[in-house]
């Protein structure tokens, strides 16, 4: 299994746990709530990235088990709830290669999550859901 980068880590958002259903994770997510308007739009009642979204804070769009970032697309393959975190394995593609990645998610408040990875170095990143 390959190690992950912070963008791939974002795929954690579609996990299901006892406290959170996948449908509850659907939406637009970013590391900076003040950047929501610069990153996301709705086209035909569907969330989409604005043209220059990658110039602003990191973000992604979650629809069920599908997660779309500005440069990658992922599909959740497996979930394991250990009580305090949900461990996820996802298959991600950057348009050139496909790889499996592993990471954890913790619900840190209403419309807030913290994504973490232990490899290649420990990384922990908070995300907030944009109201769209």
Where are these regions (language model features)?
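Bacterial N-terminal signal peptides that target proteins for export
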Residues: 1-7
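Hydrophobic helical h-region of N-terminal Sec-dependent signal peptides
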Residues: 8-12
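N-terminal signal peptide c-region/cleavage motif recognized by signal peptidases
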Residues: 15-19
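Boundary at the C-terminal end of the N-terminal hydrophobic targeting segment
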Residues: 20-24
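Short, solvent-exposed loop/hinge segments that bridge or flank secondary-structure elements
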Residues: 25-26, 31-65, 69
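Contiguous, well-ordered beta-strand patches that form the walls/edges
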Residues: 59-109
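Short, exposed beta-strand-loop hairpins at the edges of beta-sheets
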Residues: 104-106, 112-126
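Short, solvent-exposed mixed-charge patches
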Residues: 130-132
């Amino acid at each position: 299994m390959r190690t992950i980068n912070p963008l791939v880590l974002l795929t954690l958002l579609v996990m299901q746990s006892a406290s959170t259903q996948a449908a509850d994770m659907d939406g637009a997510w970013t590391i900076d709530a003040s950047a929501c308007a610069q990153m996301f739009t709705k086209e035909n009642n569907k969330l989409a990235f604005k043209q220059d979204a990658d110039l602003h804070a990191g973000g992604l769009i979650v629809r069920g088990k599908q997660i779309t970032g500005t440069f990658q697309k992922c599909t959740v393959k497996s979930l394991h709830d250990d009580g305090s975190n949900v461990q996820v394995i996802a298959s991600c593609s950057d348009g050139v290669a496909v790889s499996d990645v592993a990471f954890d998610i913790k619900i840190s408040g209403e419309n807030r999550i913290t994504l973490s990875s232990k490899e290649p170095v420990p990384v922990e990143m908070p995300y907030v859901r944009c109201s769209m």
